[in-house]
Amino acid sequence: MKFIRHMDQKDDIFQKAFSLYQVSFPEKEQRSLDDHIRALADPRFFCETIWEGEQFCGLIFYWELSGFQYIEHLAIEPSLRGSGIGSRCLEEFCKRNQKIVLEIDPPIDDISIRRKAFTSDWAFTTTDIIIFIPPIKRVVRRISC
């Protein structure tokens, strides 16, 4: 398994990854393409694709922050889900990084329940520590005069 970093939205593979991102997450959890392009310009942000040989398997978007990595999105190609690729990806990511923050929502709907189940096999612990992460969406406020 290999991870390849992408820093240019014009890259064909980035486009493939972004398409997977769009079908894998609810719209409220996504940033727009423009906001994503802004994130790519930040050296702390990593957009990596996941490969098995020549086969595109998925993506991982994460931030290198003060002493830890914050996984923002992890998605596996729909045809490969349930095959163990996601677990292997997370295992490889954990091997190359020491402190990882993986945020999941409280398990109240199908998607959050599946996410909680996926991460339950890993040595992640629940914490009450508050961290500040870069926002997913750019907020623009209009002021009327």
Show which residues each predicted segment covers.
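Short amphipathic alpha-helix that is part of the acyltransferase structural core
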Residues: 1-31, 35
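Active-site rim helix/loop that mediates acceptor-substrate recognition in acyltransferases
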Residues: 23-53
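Conserved beta-strand in the GNAT
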Residues: 49, 54-63, 68-75
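Short strand-loop junctions, especially beta-strand C-caps/beta-turns
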Residues: 74, 79, 103-107
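Conserved acetyl-CoA-binding loop-helix of GNAT-fold acetyltransferases
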Residues: 76, 82-95
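Conserved GNAT acetyl-CoA-binding A-motif
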Residues: 96-110
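Conserved active-site alpha-helix within GNAT-family acetyltransferase domains
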Residues: 107-132
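C-terminal "cap" of GNAT-fold acetyltransferases
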Residues: 132-145
